[in-house]
C-alpha cells in the first residue's frame, strides 16, 4: 500500500438536474441573437445550443471564429447553454498535422479556451470528422489536453462521435 489516492474527476454533467438536450446551429457567417431567437421559435426541450463557430483554418492550429457576444447573451437569456462547435471539414487542412505536432495542438487548445472565455461560452463541442487511422493517438492526446483546460476553466467538453463501422 503506497497511500496514493487517485484524484477523482467528476463530470460537470454529474451536477445536472436535467438531461442534456442539445441542438446544433449551422452558421454561414457571424449571426447575432436575433437569428438564434428566430431559429428557436417554437422549439421546446432544448437546453444546449451548439453553434458551428470555430473552424480549423491551417496546419498551425489557428481557428476562424464566427462567435458573437449578442448570440451568447440571447441564448443565456433564453435559458440555453452555449457550447461552441469546432470542426475540421471547412478548410483544406491536415487534421493529422495539427494534432500530431505538440505546438499546433497546444495552439489549437489555447485558441479554443481563449474564445470560450472571451465569449462566455459554457462548453466546447468537438466535431472532428474523417479522422485517419494514423491520427488516432494524436486525437486522443488532443482530447486529453483540451479536457484539462476545460476542467480548469469550468467548461463542458462534448465530443461528437459516430458509431464505428467496418469501413471507419
Identify the function of each model-found stretch:
Residues 15-30, 55-168:
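Chitinase-like catalytic core of GlcNAc-active glycosidases
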Residues 40-46, 118-121:
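Alpha-helix termination/capping residues and helix-transition junctions
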Residues 1-23, 33-42:
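Non-catalytic propeptide/linker segments at domain boundaries
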Residues 37-43, 113, 168:
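Mature extracellular/periplasmic domains of secretome proteins
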Amino acid at each position: 500500500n503506497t497511500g496514493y489516492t487517485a484524484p477523482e474527476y467528476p463530470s460537470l454533467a454529474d451536477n445536472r438536474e436535467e438531461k442534456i438536450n442539445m441542438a446544433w446551429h449551422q452558421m454561414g457567417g457571424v449571426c447575432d441573437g436575433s437569428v438564434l431567437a428566430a431559429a428557436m421559435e417554437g422549439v421546446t426541450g432544448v437546453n444546449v445550443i451548439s453553434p458551428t463557430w470555430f473552424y480549423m483554418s491551417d496546419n498551425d492550429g489557428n481557428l476562424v471564429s464566427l462567435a458573437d457576444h449578442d448570440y451568447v447573451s440571447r441564448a443565456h437569456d433564453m435559458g440555453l447553454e452555449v457550447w461552441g462547435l469546432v470542426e475540421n471539414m471547412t478548410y483544406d487542412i491536415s487534421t493529422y498535422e495539427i494534432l500530431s505536432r505538440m505546438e499546433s495542438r497546444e495552439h489549437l487548445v489555447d485558441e479554443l479556451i481563449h474564445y470560450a472565455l472571451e465569449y462566455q461560452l459554457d462548453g466546447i463541442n468537438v466535431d472532428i470528422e474523417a479522422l485517419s487511422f494514423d491520427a488516432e493517438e494524436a486525437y486522443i492526446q488532443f482530447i486529453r489536453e483540451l479536457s484539462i483546460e476545460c476542467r480548469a476553466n469550468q467548461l463542458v467538453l462534448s465530443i461528437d462521435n459516430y458509431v464505428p463501422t467496418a469501413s471507419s
